[in-house]
Amino acid sequence: MDFGFTEEDETFRTEAKRWLAAHATGVQDRRTWERTLGQAGWIGLGWPEPGYGNRTATLTQQVVWAEEYARSPAPPRSGHIGENLLAPTLIAHGTPEQKSRFLPPIAAGDELWCQGYSEPDAGSDLAGVRTTAVREPRGYRITGQKIWTSLAHEADWCFVLARTDPGARRHHGLSFLLVPMDQPGRVEVRPIRQMTGTSDFNEVFFDGAHARAEHVVGGEGNGWRVAMSLLGFERGVSTLAQQIGFAEELGRVVRTAVDTGAADDPVVRDRLVRQWAELRTMRWNALRTLGGVGDPGAPSVAKLLWAGWHQRLGELATRVRGAAAGAGPADWSPAAPYELDESQHLFLFSRADTIYGGSDQIQRTIIAERVLGLPREPKGDV
């Protein structure tokens, strides 16, 4: 594997660090921030096609940008779903008209996207979606419910997996549609209050929402193929940026262990060292995958490893705090949203890591069948 950083990469790193230092402090509005990123050409670095207002960059430069962004005080991205998921999908499956309509606004930070996949009865079993898209003279009428939809409350558009042929077998009657969210009375977004006290996810209800006929990606009935290719874009360069955040969380847990005296416990010290060693291993595995080394199951292995690692870190964070880990703020009241400290938020949010983005069970099935060559899992109607 050859994945070193060249002199040009380090020059690019210096440019990225200087720009972030000058612009990323004190950001208040995330939509404005997306436009700032777009104006500077930082959106769409990894797109395989230029010409949409995006700036092209090598793979190593994409890694540099992702890592420096993670180290900076810049806010979490609200345009990453459009940039990292929809855009590569349109480049792979979209028509020239779809690309020219949707890619420039994504690159400019002008349009934000959300993903309409999961439903109350179709999570890991994505082929079981019940949302329907009925053909009309000018497009499709969409009816159904999506759940766990990140950023739906901010998004301008949603890419929706819906059933266009109810009579077809499960994987063959689906289509991938681009749906505008600004349809009063036809699209309703309801935030989901989590046990962390925040509302990062939403329910989305489509009641006769309209999608134009030319906004079906990959053609009617080919939604499963398009949707699966999109999921392949979920784990890429962003994995390395994620690991920068993990390293910062681990550092805070180590400091807490020292401050509370928990680090005097040899069992705690052993667990801290194991977390550090495993994180380094995950980084090199990610670099190997990006460098083209590894088997087809590498993304599933990576997801399985980091999800378990992060959950164990959350458990360790509560252990080193002792009894204080269960204490809430002294001024909490039902009328005021409560605040969690970093270790509490880490523990609670990490419980979802083994579910979203493909559950551990799904990842193990992929590894078993595609890497180890074990017999396929028995299925019902396929």
Describe the residue ranges of each PLM region.
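Glycine-rich phosphate/cofactor-binding loops in nucleotide/flavin-utilizing enzymes
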Residues: 17, 60-65, 85, 226-235, ...
